UniProtKB/Swiss-Prot annotation:
Coiled coil feature spans: none
Biological role: Functions as a component of the nuclear pore complex (NPC). NPC components, collectively referred to as nucleoporins (NUPs), can play the role of both NPC structural components and of docking or interaction partners for transiently associated nuclear transport factors.
Name of protein: Nucleoporin POM34
GO cellular component, one term: nuclear outer membrane
The gene coding this protein: POM34
Membrane topology according to the record: Multi-pass membrane protein
Gene source species: Saccharomyces cerevisiae (strain ATCC 204508 / S288c) (Baker's yeast)
Keywords on record: Membrane, mRNA transport, Nuclear pore complex, Nucleus, Phosphoprotein, Protein transport, Translocation, Transmembrane, Transmembrane helix, Transport
UniProt superkingdom: Eukaryota
């Protein structure tokens, strides 16, 4: 029984205890044996090749601007040095001091030997040649960047499907035999979507006058209905009162047609004022002064 109790993890008093070969914590060996899940680094070779061929237009534009600024700054610096060296008193003094220092340094044997080697080996290297090489380097950089911006990327040999071209942002409309012009990746054109939205939201002009558009279709509150009825009544009253006349004639002026004078039903003592008059319109209470005779003064 002791052997069985020991195998079952029991002591002599039949009390359960820890097994001799088991531990509460897993061992480091068991942790190392369990495989850890890791993300792969696979990349499609077609996508890698397309990204290599794609031109970064922003970077090329910045490179062109940098070269242009460097070209202008170099020319300004060279012209300033020439002007300071030849046309100023301070520049001449500085040149004389440099020549004296150079002659003093040639008195040393090592420097004199280095000067002889320099003149025999690098006699062709002068300031004009350095200026020419700098201009040539900047010009080549600008031309190379322009060629990258204006050239089309050839992707016909990559054998891409229409779905892949759409996902990669390749312009399928401008496809030619030589290649395709890639656009921004994952770019979706919104021209068709905007046109469809405009067609859906387009409302005829007659409907806009009779029934105003609301946020929800068919939703018309009592307040909105009352306002619409009042607006319709006002338009009717305005249309009926277009041909009304007053003592000074009708105030409605039609384009190109002059209004008539006061009708015969009005009072004879009221002043007759044409409607086309744009000046002062006299009041009716001073009509007796207009009809009364007054002696004119002698000049």
């Amino acid at each position: 029984m002791k052997i069985q109790a020991g195998q079952l993890g029991l002591d002599d008093n039949d009390v359960p205890g820890p097994l001799p070969d088991t531990d509460s914590k897993p061992s480091s060996q068991s942790q190392n044996d369990t495989p850890m899940f890791k993300l792969g680094n696979f990349e499609s070779p077609v996508l890698k090749e397309l990204s290599r061929r794609t031109v970064n237009k922003e970077m090329e534009t910045q490179r062109i601007m940098t070269n242009v600024i460097a070209f202008a700054f170099w020319n300004l610096l060279v012209k300033f040095i020439k002007f300071f060296w030849n046309n100023t008193h301070v520049g001449r003094q500085f040149c004389n001091r440099l020549s004296r220092i150079h002659l003093y340094m040639l008195t040393f044997h090592t420097l004199k030997k280095a000067n002889i080697i320099y003149h025999t080996t690098f006699s062709w290297l002068n300031a004009e040649l350095l200026d020419y090489l700098f201009h040539l380097l900047i010009s080549l950089n600008i031309l190379f960047s322009l060629w990258k911006l204006l050239s089309t990327v050839k992707v016909s040999d990559l054998n891409l499907t229409d779905r892949q071209k759409k996902l990669l942002g390749v312009d399928m409309q401008s496809s030619v035999d030589t290649g395709l012009q890639p656009q921004h990746p994952h770019y979706v054109s919104t021209s068709k979507i905007s046109q469809m939205a405009q067609n859906k939201t387009h409302i005829p002009q007659t409907n806009l006058k009779n029934h105003p558009a609301y946020l929800f279709k068919g939703l018309e509150t009592p307040l909105k209905a009352r306002q619409r009825e009042m607006a319709e009544e006002q338009t009717k009253l305005q249309s009926q009162s277009l041909h009304t006349k007053n003592v000074f004639g009708t105030l409605q002026r039609h384009s190109g047609i002059s209004s008539t004078l006061v009708s015969a039903n009005n009072d004879n003592n009221s002043p007759h004022t044409p409607v086309t008059r744009k000046g002062y319109i006299p009041s009716s209470k001073y009509a007796y002064m207009m009809n009364s005779q007054s002696p004119r003064g002698k000049i």
